[in-house]
Amino acid sequence: NLPEKAGVATTSPDAVDKMLDFVKKEIEKIDLIEHVDIETSFVGAGSVYATLGKLARRSTHYSLDIENNYILEAPVFEKVYSVVKDLGLDKTKKLKGISEDSVDTLLCGISIAKAVSDVLNIERMSISGDTLREGLIYSYIAMEANEKPFSDMLGYSLENIRIFKDQKYSNTAHVYNLAVILFKQLKVIHKLSRVYVKALRIAASMYDSGKRICFDNHEKYSFNVILNSPLNGVSHKDVLLAAFTCVCQNPDNLNLSDWVKYKDILTEEDMEAVKKMGVIIKLADQLDKSRRGNVTDICCDILGDSVILKTVVKGNADFEIMEGMKLGPTFKKIFKKYLEII
């Protein structure tokens, strides 16, 4: 019982400060603290950090309500700590969206979190949506797979989604491969840096996920599916970019009023990027329209105002080439070049 150990009997602001000082002294007794590298990344897990993240997002009017991988900056943490400390237990119970169980442990928990941050001089930390339970599961899986730590958390997340959600005749994996090939081959004209690769991976893996909700205009529904999927190893910006990339499989679907909702996360440069990636993924989809994997590879030649895609096929791919050419006007609009597929 932290209040008892700290010698306080109330939850007044002064009492919270005393708990903070007590925890700091206890932490400083740990030898390991002296050896923590200044470049270490910190992750906050558990109900206290989840509540901190929720309060921080509200206080900053953060546009995206996603818990996992929310970045909590030190000034925002300080602001939330001060507010919670001054409210006390009774008023803290009135905070909207905070469960009663969380409120009961919040004052003590936030004192511990603040003490850790102060002692280690943490400028920013990631909030984990997973708890100790998930950590134990991951540890068990890692031991079984003889892989510590996971080399590609995003890859594992996407594979899990594919296994549990894909239908029997899904061509997601093949469209993903074609999209990655096109992204590399068209680098000269799309001019996108590697910071967009994770967003492309997510969007290409989940390009048709909206079909589970509604087949017609599924690109729009994919937006919400991606935002609400359990994706690890990526930032909120990556997730948002991926969601908008799916929408931009038809660039005309991109609504400016939807985009400006996230102006605290996205930039004008990002808008051009999602349009380009959206068309790349749509082209990959068109090149596997029969779902038979007829197009196995693509080589790109850029000649003046034209882009020539030379397909490597394992059978008759006339249908796929015809479907790909239907994207010509959209390709010209986004990349300012004519498209030819052979």
What are these regions (language model features)?
Residues 1-282, 288, 305, 309:
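Helical "lid/coupling" subdomains associated with nucleotide-phosphate turnover
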Residues 308-324:
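A short interface-forming secondary-structure element
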Residues 52-53, 291-292, 318-320:
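Short helix/loop capping segments that flank catalytic or ligand/cofactor-binding pockets
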Residues 294-306:
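Short edge beta-strands and adjacent turn/loop segments
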Residues 335-342:
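A short amphipathic beta-strand at an alpha->beta junction
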Residues 210, 322-333:
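Feature 926 captures the class I aminoacyl-tRNA synthetase adenylation module centered on the KMSKS loop
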Residues 283-284, 327:
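Amphipathic alpha-helical domain-onset/packing element
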